[in-house]
Design a protein with these regions (language model features):
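Structured helix-beta-strand junction loops
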Residues: 12-14, 100, 229, 256
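Generic structural signal for well-ordered alpha-helices
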Residues: 3-8, 57-65, 94, 219-223, ...
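Active-site-adjacent pocket scaffolds in enzyme catalytic domains
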Residues: 79-226
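Substrate-binding cleft of secreted/luminal carbohydrate-active enzymes
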Residues: 225-246, 263
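Flexible loop/turn segments at secondary-structure boundaries
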Residues: 1, 26-27, 89, 113-114, ...
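Residue-level detector of anion-binding/catalytic polar loops
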Residues: 16, 103, 259
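Metal-dependent polysaccharide deacetylase catalytic core of the NodB/CE4 family, i.e.
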Residues: 1-86, 145-149, 154-161, 232
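A generic structural motif
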Residues: 106-113, 259-272
Length: 272
């Protein structure tokens, strides 16, 4: 079908397709031609048994390999990203990684902390790093670890950058309209307008992932990439929330001399 053809075209062009799981889809049902989630109790992979996790990994890897190998016969999935960045505790996923030949994880966002109703995570103690190895805990680097972590790093915005960003989004609403009709789950508990305003006044800086979702200020993200001391940064993007400003940001980064590399190129260049 069309979807398989798109994936095959991706690998033919030298890019990678890897495993990404959102297990709350196990609890979905269809009503009036729409998907309805009965609950989000399985949003985190670790809400499932180890046996179920292994089963999902095997099914996903086998499906992706089956599709990709029609275009590239020796293709093999080697990386994983957990839905909602929820990869901890890793002990429960380790067997699935080993059985399925997963050597790379990219679920960690150094500096991020979320306390939501659906899930919570805490990577606030991790320093920015382009890559590292780990063994039993993705938050503890181990040079002898068998699994590679390629974090999605972030940057901090000052209060004034935050204000300028908000104004830019308001003035460029057409560029901020998403192409798709999908929505991401809200992981932040609802708070009052007053509480948000007070939080804004008290904070001196705001953490943001390097990402291309929603409205993107090209000048801001290029400046933050240039200021990074890392040898490379990973930028995340969800097709369902891409906008015209997302595409313009990619063009702007390229025009400024930044190069986009595939996972294969990164692993080979840095001999990871």
């Amino acid at each position: 079908g069309k979807f398989e053809s798109q994936l095959q075209e991706i690998v033919i062009r030298g890019h990678r397709i890897e495993l990404h799981l959102h297990p709350h889809w196990l609890d979905v049902r269809k009503e009036n031609n729409e998907w309805v989630f009965q609950s989000y109790k399985h949003y985190k992979l670790n809400s499932l048994t180890e046996e179920k996790i292994i089963e999902l990994f095997q099914e996903g890897v086998e499906l992706l390999n089956h599709i990709a190998r029609k275009a590239v016969p020796d293709y093999a999935v080697c990386a994983f990203r957990a839905g909602g960045w929820c990869v901890e505790p890793f002990e429960k996923l380790r067997s699935a990684f080993q059985i399925c030949g997963i050597k790379v994880d990219s679920s960690v966002v150094p500096g991020m902390r979320l306390d939501g109703e659906v899930h919570a995570l805490d990577y606030s103690g991790l320093k920015s790093n382009a890559f590292y190895r780990f063994s039993d805990d993705v938050r503890i680097p181990d040079k002898n670890g068998k699994t590679i972590e390629l974090p999605v790093n972030g940057y901090y915005m000052s209060r004034w950058e935050k204000i300028a960003f908000a104004l830019g989004r308001k003035m460029n609403r057409k560029n901020a309209e998403i192409f798709g009709d999908g929505k991401g789950i809200s992981v932040i508990a609802a708070v009052s307008v007053r509480k948000r305003f007070m939080s804004f006044l008290q904070k001196g800086k705001y953490f943001n992932q390097f990402m291309l979702d929603g409205y993107i200020n090209s000048v801001l993200i290029e400046r933050k990439v240039s200021q990074s001391e890392l040898p490379f940064v990973s930028i995340v993007a969800h097709p369902k929330t891409l906008t015209l400003s997302s595409l313009r940001a990619v063009e702007y980064l390229a025009a400024k001399g930044h190069h986009f590399r595939s996972l294969t190129e990164i692993l080979e260049k840095y001999e990871i």
